[in-house]
Amino acid sequence: MSFQESFSPKAATLLAGIAMGESPRWHDNRLWLSDWGAREILAVDAGGRSEIMLRTPFELPFCIDWLPDGRLLIVAGRENRLVRWEPDGSLVTHADLRGVSDGAWNEIVIDGRGNAYVNGGPGIIALVTADRAVRQVADGIAFPNGMAITPDNRTLIVAESHGKKLTAFDIAADGGLSNRRIWADLVTGVPDGICIDAENAVWYADVPNKQCVRVREGADVLQTVDVDRGCFACMLGGHEKKTLFIVAAEWRGMEKIAEVARARTGQLLTVETVVPGAGWP
């Protein structure tokens, strides 16, 4: 791994007091996120004003992303369902994931064609097509976490947290995944949530190393942002999509997750970047 243009700008706190933030998404000029610890979905504007958009009945994990028609999908991870938030405020089942796996589901990314990729279970990725058909498209992933899709809809990149790498797949016309390959071997990096920018570089959040890192294919490190707590996910947004939003919190292990949620150490941080966000999410 080589290091080029590496520096560590200081992150600013936009919002504090989050129980346990995850799944940040830029939508309708606000940063949306799932607060797993409070079972809420929040939207935060550029001034740090937050609004509870939805109180969910779901236990963690519940990650979010938007269909092209503007409807929100929520991964009800422990219920093995993909849920859709309707304009009237109701929650309806968009897809039943039990036919693929009854293990807990985790992250989601939706491409420009309306295909939803959901991962979790025993290291798998499922595809829910625009017509809501469900099938498995990848397996053998070492703790799948964040996913991103390139602007041309041709490549999906997934974070393998336990594998300490980013893995890429080609996306077929029918949404299937093939040509699996290591996109970046991070060596000591532990990727969680990820996003992609207009230069096809990936930002990944890293909980144990308390940082967000920008890498290009091949694992060259371009930028790092170090903070004082674990970074769970990141998203490029803002007016020009050049603001990196980071959801961070203290991490004391899964056995103390309720304790961490009660302490509300979660923060939404921001860092200004040069290259805008692109692709999905």
Range-by-range predicted roles:
Residues K164-K165, F169, G176-R180, A184-D220:
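Loop/turn-rich, solvent-exposed surfaces of beta-rich toroidal or solenoidal domains
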Residues M1-G17, A46-G48, R180, V271-V274:
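A short helix->beta-strand "capping" segment at the edge of beta-propeller domains
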Residues M235-P281:
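Blade-level signature of beta-propeller repeat domains, shared across WD40, Kelch, NHL, RCC1
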Residues K10-L15, R49-R55, L91-R98, A133-D139, ...:
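A short beta-strand motif characteristic of beta-propeller blades
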Residues M1-P9, N29, G37-A38, V44, ...:
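Blade/loop signatures of beta-propeller domains
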Residues F169-G176, T273-A278:
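Short loop/turn segments immediately following beta-strands, especially the blade-tip
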Residues W36, G77-R78, G121-P122, S161, ...:
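Short loop/turn segments immediately following the C-termini of beta-strands
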Residues L14-R30, T56-A76, R98-I124, V137-T155, ...:
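Beta-rich, blade/repeat-based domains predominating
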